[in-house]
Amino acid sequence: TILSQQESVVNAIRPHLLPLQSPVDLDSLIDHIGTSKIVMLGEASHGTHEYYTWRAMISQRLIREKGFSFIAVEGDWPDCYRLNRYVKNYSGAGDSAYEVLHSFNRWPTWMWANWEVVAFAEWLYDHNKSIPVNKKTGFYGLDVYSLWESMESIIKYLRRVDPAALEIAERAFYCFEPYQGEEGTGYAYASLLVPEPCTQEVVNLLAEMQRNAPKYNTDQ
């Protein structure tokens, strides 16, 4: 039965459980992470207080004790970059994390615009205060739902700082243009039928921006 299967799973997991009652209970996890450069933190449900709170505590220790330099979340890049500007103490970035997160407007807004993220962002803001600009810990979004907003932000930026790379960015944008208005799902379906339709354009853009990264000395 389903109940017996669930009990079997619970019984298999129980010997490996580690109680989480205080921050020191994370010690074994932090030790186990060792010298890893990437740590992926998930959740069983979006928006659950306990997951967000413990994930924030883990992130804080990774930043303080392991030297981690950025947080990447399942969020829209343009929106999350506004929060990134705030936690890095950039001029004109907003007066509070609450104010910045209030601008998140894509459903589900509560996924990141919640009090747990506000608290973590304010901690990150304080943590970054005494750190050199190039060493501050950032906060970035990498979800594909903001495909069009992200591409428009890239084009707007390159139009001002790197006209040569702008042409490459526009080629990538035009490749995706037939699928605009479909939140990327149209492109996903098309990629099943047409091998690598826009891959090379995106790779070319990424390579060009990485090559020129040292001269991109502005965050706008």
Q: Which ranges hold each PLM region?
A:
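Structured catalytic-domain cores with a bias toward divalent-metal coordination
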Residues: 1-220
